[in-house]
From Swiss-Prot:
Function: Self assembles to form an icosahedral capsid. Most capsids appear to be large particles with an icosahedral symmetry of T=4 and consist of 240 copies of capsid protein, though a fraction forms smaller T=3 particles consisting of 180 capsid proteins. Entering capsids are transported along microtubules to the nucleus. Phosphorylation of the capsid is thought to induce exposure of nuclear localization signal in the C-terminal portion of the capsid protein that allows binding to the nuclear pore complex via the importin (karyopherin-) alpha and beta.
Compartments reported by the entry: Virion; Host cytoplasm
Cellular component aspect of the GO annotation: host cell; host cell cytoplasm; T=4 icosahedral viral capsid
Protein name: Capsid protein
Species the sequence originates in: Woodchuck hepatitis B virus (isolate 8) (WHV)
Family statement: Belongs to the orthohepadnavirus core antigen family.
Sequence repeats: 160-166, 167-174, 175-182
PTM per Swiss-Prot/TrEMBL: Phosphorylated by host SRPK1, SRPK2, and maybe protein kinase C or GAPDH. Phosphorylation is critical for pregenomic RNA packaging. Protein kinase C phosphorylation is stimulated by HBx protein and may play a role in transport of the viral genome to the nucleus at the late step during the viral replication cycle.
Quaternary structure annotation from Swiss-Prot or TrEMBL: Homodimerizes, then multimerizes. Interacts with cytosol exposed regions of viral L glycoprotein present in the reticulum-to-Golgi compartment. Interacts with human FLNB. Phosphorylated form interacts with host importin alpha; this interaction depends on the exposure of the NLS, which itself depends upon genome maturation and/or phosphorylation of the capsid protein. Interacts with host NUP153.
Comp. bias intervals (Basic residues): 150-181
Pfam families recorded: Hepatitis_core
Keywords: Capsid protein, Cytoplasmic inwards viral transport, DNA-binding, Host cytoplasm, Host-virus interaction, Microtubular inwards viral transport, Phosphoprotein, Repeat, RNA-binding, T=4 icosahedral capsid protein, Viral penetration into host nucleus, Virion, Virus entry into host cell
Amino acid sequence: MDIDPYKEFGSSYQLLNFLPLDFFPDLNALVDTATALYEEELTGREHCSPHHTAIRQALVCWDELTKLIAWMSSNITSEQVRTIIVNHVNDTWGLKVRQSLWFHLSCLTFGQHTVQEFLVSFGVWIRTPAPYRPPNAPILSTLPEHTVIRRRGGARASRSPRRRTPSPRRRRSQSPRRRRSQSPSANC
């Protein structure tokens, strides 16, 4: 069965695979970032968003991977076999966890639509032959003007920011308007 964990987020595993393997930060750096930015949301009882749920699941997978590698390191006596297995785990499962953490952290940080646009534009850029493409790849950290950065905490964080409508103009004084008396020079 071919399951794409990014389909419900409007993306695909194929789009993430356009990014080079060294694009994704180290797993420990991603875990530290997730913990630093979203510890309350990840450890709390309340459901925040599908991205938070996916990060929780990726962190559980990462924890199980580290336990598996520790077990293999202590139980496999052949250094060569141990190295082959650890490298295979890091290159396959570790990469999938890195991709997942990067994707969901980026969606929470920059917005899902911005990440989607980045993946598509990078995919187009990388598939364009070198002589015909611009020299610089698209950059995710360059935010378009219309991107809304999410607010931290509270129930309002999940809603879009409130639009401010202009308030009606008020009179300068609250007392009824008085008619100005005309000056004597105005009568001339």
